[in-house]
Amino acid sequence: MSELLFDGMSLTVEIRFGGTWTDVTEYVRNVSTSRGRSSELDTYSTGSCNITLDNRTRLFDPENTAGPYYGNLTPLRSVRIKATSGATTYDIFRGYIEQWPQSYINPNDAFVTITASDAFKVLNMSILPSHWEIAIGAEKLRWFRMADFSGSFYVFDSANSRSTSAQWMSSAGAGVTSFCNPGPPLIVGESTTSSAFDGARFVQAVDPLGINGVTPLYSEWSVEMWIQTTETEDGNYGIWNHGDFIHGGSLGMVVAGGNATLVGQFGNRGNSNAMYTNNVQVTVNDGRPHHVYMTYRSNPSSFTVQELYVDGSNLDVSTGSFTDVVEQGYSFMTIGAPIYKSATASNNFTKYFRGSIQEVVVWGQVFDGSFGNEPLDHYESGSGKRYQGDLTGLRMAYLLGFVNWPYDLTDLAAGQSTVLGLITTGKNVLDALREMETAEQGRLFISKNGSVKFVDRNALGEGNFVTVQAQFDDLGRNDVNHGIPYTDITFTYDDRYIFNDIVVRQPGGNFAEAEDSTSQSKYFKRTSTIDNVQVDNGYLLTNIAASRLTQYKDPEIRIDSLTVNGRAEPAKQGSILNLEIGDRVTVIRTPAVGTEIEKTLIIEGVKHSFTTDSWIVTFNTSPTNNAPFVLDSSLLGVLDTNVLGY
C-alpha cells in the first residue's frame, strides 16, 4: 500500500515488540489521535489513538505462529507516532496498545484497528502500594526520606529545633556538610545514584554528640524502612547500621544460592560482650517492596527484646549469642553501604545494597502492646499517611517513584503550593496526581512524547505559555505575513463559563468562598465548588477562589476550537507539528464587514487524523484570562486583562 507521505511530511508508526522499536508504517492505512481536554475547566482526559494496519498477510494476527511478531502481539505494547517535516522530526503520540481486534472484510482483505491509550490509563491502573505508610504521631529520632526520583534525602530531628550536623558522603569519602536548623527539613545531599545504591554513592548521617544529647542510641530503640530489590548475586549486603560500643545495631541482607534473607545484629560491648543475631527466613529479593521493622531493648546487661519483622509479621529465627561485637566506637549511621564489624563477626556486610531503600525511620522506643503497634500498622494498606510540607511537584515525583514510573518519561515542575500529607494507600496514582494539580491550580497532562507533564503556576507565566508559538488566519488573509490557514472555527458566547460564587474546600471541611454581587445580579447566582484541595494553608484556598472568580464572573466571547488542513500549505507543516498543549497562539478572523478580530488563546487539546490522502488537525483552545499578572511584562502586566497571581 502507499506510504503516509504528505507534500514532504512523512508519518512514522512504531511498535515496541520485545525490547526494540519496529517500524510498521508501510502497513498503516489510517491514524487518529486525541490528547488534552475541550476547555480549561475540564480534566485532562486519557489520550487515545486508533491505527488501522493492513493484515492481509496475518502479520498482526496473535494466532499466526509463523508470523515474525508471534508472542509479542499482546496488550500494553508501547506504540509511538512521529512526523518528519524537512529535517525535523516531531512527536505526535506515545501510548500503550489495548487490543488487537481482527477484521476480515472478504477473503482478499483483512486489517487490524488497534486502539491505544496514553500513560494516564496506566497510572489509573497503578495502585499506591502500602509502603506509603509512615507514622504520624510518635516521636522520630531520625527520618530519611530516600527520595527515589532524584537521590536526595531528608534528615531532621523530632522537633526540628536542634542544629544537628548531617553529612552526605561518596564512597571515596568526599562530601558536603549541611545542618538541620529550625524550620523545614533540608536536602542535605544530592546524588543521582544514591537512590539505587549501586556502589557509587552511599549516605551517612554523622552526629558525634549522640542523638538527643544522650548515648548514641537509646538502650531501647527500633528502626523501620521499606526495601525493594531483585539482587541474586551471592554475598552480604549492608542496609542500615548505627554502630557504637554500647547499643549498636545493623541490618543486612544475605544472598545465598540466589535467595535473599535479612539478618539483624545487635551489640552490647562492655556488658555481656555479645552479639545477638536474628535471621528472618523470608525471601526479600522478589522485586516487591517489603516492610522491615527491627527492635532492640537492653536492661543493660541482658537482652530482653530483639526482634525482626518483615511485612508485618515476626518470623525471625534467633540464632543465639556470639563473641563478636559491633566495633564502631562512635555514633554514626550508614544506609545502603558496607558494614564492617570485626574479624570474627558472623556477618560482615561487605557489599553495597542494590535496589531501593525508602522511608528509613529511627524510633526512640520499641512499639509493643504498651506503646501501641504503630510501625507494624504502617504495613497495613488503607490507613493513610501524612507528609506535611511537600511542594506539589515533589509529591508528584514521590507518587510516580513509588510505582516505578520511568524517569525519562517524567517532566515535573517543582510546584508553588505546599500540600497536606493526607494520602490513602489503595487509591490509584492518577487520582493522587490530579489532587496535586488541583492544589497547585496548574496543568497535568501527557505530552506528545509520552511524558507525564506537570506545569505549576510559576511556569504558567513563562515560556510557551507567554510567548506566541503560532498564528492562525482564515483563508481570506493572503498577505506575506499570514499564519497557518484554518478551515473551520467555533465561537461561543453562552452561560457555560459564568460562575460568580466560588467555593474551595480542604479535606476536613475548611473552605473559602468568593462571590461577586454585580455578576449575580445580572446572571443569577452560579456556584462552582472545588473539593478536596490539599493545600496546607487557608490563604491558598482564598487565593484559588478569588482567582477563579476573576476569570469566570463575566461572560466572554470564546474560540473553543479551530480546524486545520495540514496539507493546505506545506511550508506551515512544521509550525503545526511543533504545537503542544499549553502553547500560546493567536487567531485572526477576517469578517465580511468591519476590522479584523484577533484572539490570543491557549491550546488545551490536539487531535490528528491521517489517511493515505488527508491530514486534518483540530485544536481545542481557551482564553488567556487565567494568565497571571506579571510586573514589568508588556504581555502579562496589564490589569483587567490578567489575573493577579498567587
Q: Can you name each region flagged by the protein language model?
A:
Residues 85-93, 101-202, 210, 214-215, ...:
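Charged- and aromatic-enriched interaction segments used to assemble
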Residues 47-49, 93, 110-112, 450, ...:
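Envelope-exposed proteins and targeting segments
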Residues 1-129, 163, 169-182, 244-245, ...:
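Beta-strand-rich assembly/attachment modules of structural machines
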Residues 48-50, 113, 141, 220-224, ...:
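Intrinsic-disorder/low-complexity, polar/charged segments enriched in Ser/Thr/Lys/Arg/Asp/Glu/Gln
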Residues 1-29, 133-210, 220-223, 233-235, ...:
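Acidic, small/polar-enriched beta strand-loop surface segments
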